[in-house]
Amino acid sequence: MHDMRNTARLVGVCSLVGGAAWTAACFVHNSLPQGCIDAECDGHAMRGSSPVATTLFVVAGLMLAGAGVGLLLLARERNGGLGRAAVAAGVCGALGLLLLGSAAVVSAVDNDWNGMPGLVVPGVLLLAAGLVLLAVAVIRARVVPVWCSALLLASALVLPFANEQTSRILLAVPFGVCWALLGVVVLRRPAAVQREAHAGAGTM
């Protein structure tokens, strides 16, 4: 019981910090000169990154990864085990974060590397797929209110349309806001999350 409450609180803190860092990173990144997409890059420099934006995105990635793992643990307690959606969410999310992390490292070394889309595009798609599956697993387990999971799901579906080269990076802002909101919800009701998880496990 005590461990589940601690897990819920950890999820809340990671979600809130990660969501806030992600949102701030999007605005900081958008303050940089506009980049280019595909054919527009002929004679036009791609948008790089800044140390502040990169640091914020790294913090956000680590915090949200921790929050995602915590949510899966709560869902496992709720359902008495991890379903296929939860396992697939973990795999897709991990691969997506690995690719995006690699892109961040490469960007710090060479902002104009032509192969960047090969890391960013599949990374974003895998991350979005993992988040959709995570939202499905959380909705099924009712770890948090359904409306909160639904907002996270909707923001994940918008994520692939964001692009770090233009102001379309702001399409990723709702994703960070929804994670921060989820963190607030969990922190305000960690005991309730714990009770729901154990109640669900008891009915399996």
Could you tell me what each predicted segment is?
Residues 2-204:
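Hydrophobic, aromatic-enriched alpha-helical segments typical of multi-pass transmembrane helices
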